[in-house]
Amino acid sequence: MTALTGRPVVYCGVCSLPPEYCEYGGTVKKCQQWLEKNQPTMYSRIWSPEVLEAEMASLSVEAQERAMKDAKKKAAKAEAAEQKQADKRANSVVTIKRIERNKRKYVTSVSGLEAFGLELKKVAKDFGKKFATGSSVTKVPSGGEEIVVQGDVSGEIEEFILEKYKEVPEDNIELVEDKKKKKGEGN
C-alpha cells in the first residue's frame, strides 16, 4: 500500500489565504502584486485578462454590473482602511517613561507600541532577554496596555526599538521622566 501525501498548498504572503480566495479579502491589490511577483504561473491562471474576461462573459449583464460595482466598492473600502491605518501609525507616539519607585529604584514603562502592529508580549520578552530584567505587559487604567521593564533602561530601550523594530520611526518615540512626588509637595 502506498503512503498518501498531502497536496502542496500555496498561501498568500499578504492575507495568508490560498490565492484563489484573495479576492474575498480586503487586500486584493496587494495580494495580486504579491502573487505576480512570487507565483507568476498561478497569477496567470487566476488573474490573467483572458481568464477574467471568460468569467465575466459567463455572467448576465445585471450580474456583470453588480460585480463591477462591488469591485469598485471593495477597492475604495480597502484603500480607505489602508489610509486610515497609515494615518494612525503616523500620528501615534511610543512613550518611554522612567518612573521612580523607591529612593534609587526605577521602572521603565513603554506604551504605544501596539499602534505599529507589534505584539506586546513578544516585545516584552525581547526586552527581558536584552536587558536581563523582568518585563511584563500590564493594563493601563485608560484602557490600553503598556510594557513595564524593571530598571532604568529608557535610553537603551529607545535604541533597541529603533534597531530591532524598523516599523517604528524615530520621530514617534518620546522619552519622559516621571518623578515621584515628595511628601511635602502634595496638596
From Swiss-Prot:
The yes or no answer to whether the keyword Cytoplasm is present is: yes
Q: Which CDD domains match?
A: DENR_C
What are the BP-aspect GO terms? formation of translation preinitiation complex; nuclear-transcribed mRNA catabolic process, nonsense-mediated decay; ribosome disassembly; translation reinitiation
InterPro entries, per this entry? DENR/SUI1_TIF, DENR_C, DENR_eukaryotes, DENR_N, SUI1, SUI1_dom_sf
Classify the main location. Answer: cytoplasm
- The keyword Cytoplasm is assigned to this record: yes
List keywords of the entry alphabetically.
Answer: Cytoplasm
**SUPFAM superfamilies tied to this protein:** eIF1-like
Chain ranges of the SUI1 domain:
94-165
Q: Name one GO molecular function term.
A: translation initiation factor activity
- Enumerate the PROSITE patterns for this protein: SUI1 (PS50296)
A Pfam family it matches:
SUI1
Give me the Gene Ontology terms describing cellular component: cytoplasm
Compartments it resides in: Cytoplasm
Quote the subunit structure annotation.
Answer: Interacts with the 40S ribosomal subunit.
**What family does the Swiss-Prot or TrEMBL record give for this protein?**
Belongs to the DENR family.
NCBIfam families in the record: DRP1
Free-text note regarding domains: The SUI1 domain may be involved in RNA binding.
- What name is this protein filed under? Translation machinery-associated protein 22
